[in-house]
Amino acid sequence: MAETQRPVLVVDFGAQYAQLIARRVREASVYSEVVPHTATVEEIAAKKPLAVILSGGPASVYAEGAPQLDPRLFDLNLPVFGICYGFQAMAQALGGTVAHTGTREYGRTELNIDGGVLHGGLPTIQPVWMSHGDAVTDAPEGFEVTGTTAGAPVAAFEDRARRLAGVQYHPEVLHSPHGQQVLSRFLHELAGIPASWTPSNIADVLVEQVRAQVGDGHAICGLSGGVDSAVAAALVQRAIGDRLTCVFVDHGLLRAGEREQVQQDFVASTGAKLVTVDAVDKFLGELKGVTDPEEKRKIIGREFIRSFEDAVRQIVDEQGAAEGKQPEVEFLVQGTLYPDVVESGGGTGTANIKSHHNVGGLPEDLEFELVEPLRLLFKDEVRAVGRELGLPEEIVARQPFPGPGLAIRIIGEVTADRLATLRQADAIAREELTAAGLDRQIWQCPVVLLADVRSVGVQGDGRTYGHPIVLRPVSSEDAMTADWTRLPYEVLERISTRITNEVAEVNRVVLDVTSKPPGTIEWE
């Protein structure tokens, strides 16, 4: 992206919210990247940023070993916006005063506004989300104080002439209801950055990048049925046409209709070449008698690699035979997203890609150069690009689904009968959530079969002894944390009634109301 988009750099001072800040910048139609606080001023300048945002962080600016802000950053004459710790570090570097006031503010706090570019016209008293012990007590010379709280005499300031500003609170979180507006005003009004980061522009840039990387070569992409691999494949197909071959391994652990969705909807909307590997019997055979969730995952991962490897070998050999020369499928497409890049230490998302990367346990003689067209995108951007490329909503809006599939939503041994039971219950839950218009209000809704548990019930004139089904609806922005979704009672009632009436082996439906933490989203 660097060739065409100058970024706003989010300097990460160890905040759990650095990625969220980058997302909020992009929601304001401005491209952003995360860089570590160890990045030097020279490294920052080399990226030619349009602006710099200093994130929050857990440290005190006075603590030994706390991340420091190099004052030379301000010699670059860039717009700079400080948040929480970044606000304090900015104030200190420019000659202001940061002190231990003895008053800590955590959680919801009232902010009192006194004009300014960023807050002008907004409610003069507004709720914000705070998380600080130290506070700025005197603003640097040239700054106007535009906000105060009970525990922070300087909670917001601006130096409009130098395009510098900052806030003590967290504008990036939903608990600061005017925060996105404040961030947008910094980007567009104070920094003067145009709103040019849009799905159509993103798609055009990514297609050109793939063309430049692949050239006249051939590529392979493993489709999982999920949105990431589907959008990655659609982008590459748009770029190189029938020189892309997609491989879809059906391990029998998918939800109802997902194989058909890939084979029909994806192919129809993209025109991509698709090879389907039917490995249902192979996977179920290997999973026979296995109840330990970690063992399930290992078996599924191993067998998937073997199945994909066999398909890739066949494609490589056929490609070479068709062209009358040595096989030349040089590229492997993966749906890596920006959070994966940041969390693996890639930081800015511009780390060099190894020219021949041995991926995912493939044998050493199958070496590919990675094509990762989504590596600078967040999940919501991937969906937007998918829509821009014309992928059907059934694929683009698909909820996250684990790689091991329904195997880790069956608590107990995985069998064909148990898969059929869970598949039917899951389909009912999804149908009712869609009918109620709740698909986009939840992150995902795992449906879990307690296959090794039976409960007594009464249906008709007789007693039943069936399995419980667990509904696990959760709301989240990034799956790092999640809250259970408060679904309307009438929707829950319809789901429960239909499952217990239509799924023969189930006589009880229960609701999981555990947040993450302490519970994970998936049961296994």
Curated annotation (Swiss-Prot):
> What is the enzyme's class at the highest EC level?
ligase
Q: Which GO terms describe its cellular component?
A: cytosol
* GO molecular function terms attached to this record: ATP binding; GMP synthase activity
Q: Which residues bind ATP?
A: S224, G225, G226, V227, D228, S229, A230
The EC code for this enzyme is 6.3.5.2
InterPro entries per the record?
Class_I_gatase-like, GATASE, GMP_synth_C, GMP_synth_GATase, GMP_synthase, GMPS_ATP_PPase_dom, NAD/GMP_synthase, Rossmann-like_a/b/a_fold
Record's subunit section: Homodimer.
Q: What is this protein called?
A: GMP synthase [glutamine-hydrolyzing]
